[in-house]
Amino acid sequence: MRQGAARGCRWFVVWALLGLTLGVLVASAAPSSPGTPGVAAATQAANGGPATPAPPAPGPAPTGDTKPKKNKKPKNPPPPRPAGDNATVAAGHATLREHLRDIKAENTDANFYVCPPPTGATVVQFEQPRRCPTRPEGQNYTEGIAVVFKENIAPYKFKATMYYKDVTVSQVWFGHRYSQFMGIFEDRAPVPFEEVIDKINAKGVCRSTAKYVRNNLETTAFHRDDHETDMELKPANAATRTSRGWHTTDLKYNPSRVEAFHRYGTTVNCIVEEVDARSVYPYDEFVLATGDFVYMSPFYGYREGSHTEHTSYAADRFKQVDGFYARDLTTKARATAPTTRNLLTTPKFTVAWDWVPKRPSVCTMTKWQEVDEMLRSEYGGSFRFSSDAISTTFTTNLTEYPLSRVDLGDCIGKDARDAMDRIFARRYNATHIKVGQPQYYLANGGFLIAYQPLLSNTLAELYVREHLREQSRKPPNPTPPPPGASANASVERIKTTSSIEFARLQFTYNHIQRHVNDMLGRVAIAWCELQNHELTLWNEARKLNPNAIASATVGRRVSARMLGDVMAVSTCVPVAADNVIVQNSMRISSRPGACYSRPLVSFRYEDQGPLVEGQLGENNELRLTRDAIEPCTVGHRRYFTFGGGYVYFEEYAYSHQLSRADITTVSTFIDLNITMLEDHEFVPLEVYTRHEIKDSGLLDYTEVQRRNQLHDLRFADIDTVIHADANAAMFAGLGAFFEGMGDLGRAVGKVVMGIVGGVVSAVSGVSSFMSNPFGALAVGLLVLAGLAAAFFAFRYVMRLQSNPMKALYPLTTKELKNPTNPDASGEGEEGGDFDEAKLAEAREMIRYMALVSAMERTEHKAKKKGTSALLSAKVTDMVMRKRRNTNYTQVPNKDGDADEDDL
């Protein structure tokens, strides 16, 4: 009803303005043609008789019930005509009834209404102006700084050191040309606490033995199957990115080669390895980068109540050392600061790490976002924290969330204050002030919001009011708990969802809701104010046209009249358009100079009912009276609403009909200025990154596999090949034999081992040389050459035995047999036979030579037999020398030159 009233009021104002405008335009455009007595008009008698033509117009005049020709419309409205042309009106235009039928055919839904005068039985009044609503807004909008925390899914990481000994026992069968492993036993043994502290950390050495328990039996493994010694730790061959390592040996010990026997060899490799360790909430165990689990809390110890932490091992397997100075096994440098060192022995290894207290080393929450501008608004029973920077809205309760309920949440307050102070100093220090202390709220999805309210410096006087409001939101019991109560207070771990989409959707909904509510609020306010303004116009317009105002108000056609400050209304009766006939003249024949201001009509309530005379009112109203009279004026032009169109009367006579489309429409609507929803781009926002999700697990399988596959490369020499030596057993036996004889035996052993080694090397060299084809050929040639030399030596010995002089002096004997010197032959002839003295001397010399040879043989045999034989030989030598000195004289040398010439 209010909407209809508003439309009616606007139409009334517009039509009033339009009527005044058209009147002015018509008056200014109409030509002045006074003295037009022959105006052609068809009038109808008061009893409703047929219309008759006016006299001075020649020809028959159209009657009132003449039907207009169908589909005959003027192309353009005819211009105003002077009064003298009234005779041509009937001939130049179609009859009124034909035009009316055209209008009725085009607008079959146009109805007419007969409105009886109201009697006052029903009266109405207008509603008083209403109080317009205010725009819906959130309560207590507050700006501030926020730090959003999420669940910390990252594990607690720390450095640990592993001490263990790799024990390898290999069984080898040696053949003549090959070796075969019959079995390899590998095990890992822990390093005792004393060895870790007194040997490895103090001196950088490790024992060559491994003592450990397997199957409840204590066993000991000896490196190289030898006595216990200290072995130097050396850096590993290949270090990883996150750890270092040291070990004592690169090569596996294999037993000495003894063909056709099974031999065993033991290798003990002491390994010290720095590894990364991880532990996740509730920190009851941790795992090493090698994949080994330790079922003890990394915070277990004997200090500050840490003995209450979880452990699955016996007490004698754990040791805590205060004032421990770690040593770098590569540089041998000692740490400058002492630490508290935890040591734990497991069946496979010993692990050590620096002990730290649980608080504040770990925290179950971590900082996610720092928001410079966070708007907090109150909707119903919740707070909504919205930020355009991250396109997110968080919903929380109105009460703060106490940090004491967060298990291991010591880092929250410190990190939040540091971030807020940094943001405030950078951005708000000169324009805003802080309101109270940071507040903490638990949002949906497991996000903890640390919020610092801010106030502009211009609103500083409102600080007290805001502070009081904040105090009302504090928990019911803000007093600090008594000592010891925190231990009994229930704590919880906040679980944060891995998706932020719900907060993004909440932000989108709030963004749209805020825009729509603001828009609808403005529309509601404008509508209410417009209604109040129009109500004043309606109150004034009802005095001018109560029928139109009443019809627009009640939403249907009624008749009304003012009864003081109220209106009396009556319901109008609809009349079909086919039962209404308009007459073609508006002049009153009985009263010259008087004319009707509205066209006259005849109508029937029903199709076969009696004809009723009346007058056409406004908006297709059929008035039962004909009292709308005005003085006739010159240049009269009027447009009257008739059915679905208009009828045009000129000089109080019908001219032609027009449709509504032929009249220019002036809009009375007020444009509604609605701001379109602005574009908003969502930025990618992740609660947990891929790296955080990947790193959240307790065990990094990639790191474990990488370390396991690098173990042999780091702590073993995979390139060196040891060939089995058959003489190794002999050398090992000789070495062990001489080692048991003390220092002198070791000295002698070195000499003997050197000689034996040389012999073995020579034999090995010969064997290697013989195995070469070229060497075998060379040896064959040498053998043939040796046989040839032996043959010639044998021949020489045989000749020496048969004829020594000929063998010793072949040339001399040859010259004696065949003399070539003539002088010698002559002298021989003169001299005759050989000199007997010289022959005797020669015989004597030969005899003494034989004697000397016999004496030397006797002395040599006496040396072999003993001391008595040696004395006998000496006495014999003295006798022979004495005898030789008395009987032997030197042969004169005076004939030497002659003898030489003779020879």
UniProtKB/Swiss-Prot annotation:
The residue numbers the entry assigns to motif Internalization motif are 888-891
- Asked whether the keyword Disulfide bond is assigned, the reply is yes
Name the major location: virion
- Chain residue ranges for the region called Hydrophobic membrane proximal region: 718-771
- How does it get modified post-translation? The cytoplasmic tail is phosphorylated by the viral kinase US3. Phosphorylation may be linked to a down-regulation of gB expression on cell surface.
* Residue ranges annotated as Intravirion topological domain: 795-903
List the ranges whose topology is Virion surface: 30-773
Disulfide-bonded cysteines: C115-C572, C132-C528, C206-C270, C363-C411, C595-C632
Where is motif Golgi targeting found?
A: 848-851
Q: Which Pfam families match?
A: Glycoprot_B_PH1, Glycoprot_B_PH2, Glycoprotein_B
Q: Which SUPFAM superfamilies match?
A: Viral glycoprotein ectodomain-like
* Record: glycosylation sites: N86, N140, N397, N429, N488, N673
Give the transmembrane region(s): 774-794
Give GO terms: molecular function aspect only.
receptor ligand activity
Q: Where is this region: Involved in fusion and/or binding to host membrane?
A: 172-178, 257-264
The record's section on InterPro entries has: Glycoprot_B_PH1, Glycoprot_B_PH2, Glycoprot_B_PH2_sf, Glycoprotein_B_ecto_C, Herpes_Glycoprot_B
Signal peptide residues are 1-29
Name the Gene Ontology biological process terms: symbiont entry into host cell; virion attachment to host cell
**How would you describe this protein's topology in the membrane?**
Single-pass type I membrane protein
Quote the subunit structure annotation: Homotrimer; disulfide-linked. Interacts with host receptor MYH9/NMMHC-IIA. Interacts with host receptor MYH10/NMMHC-IIB. Interacts with the host coreceptor PILRA. Binds to heparan sulfate proteoglycans. Interacts with gH/gL heterodimer. Interacts with gD.
Give the family from UniProt: Belongs to the herpesviridae glycoprotein B family.
HAMAP family from the xrefs? Answer: HSV_GB
- What is the designated name of this protein? Envelope glycoprotein B
- Native organism is Human herpesvirus 1 (strain F) (HHV-1)
According to the entry, what is the taxonomic lineage of the organism? Answer: Viruses, Duplodnaviria, Heunggongvirae, Peploviricota, Herviviricetes
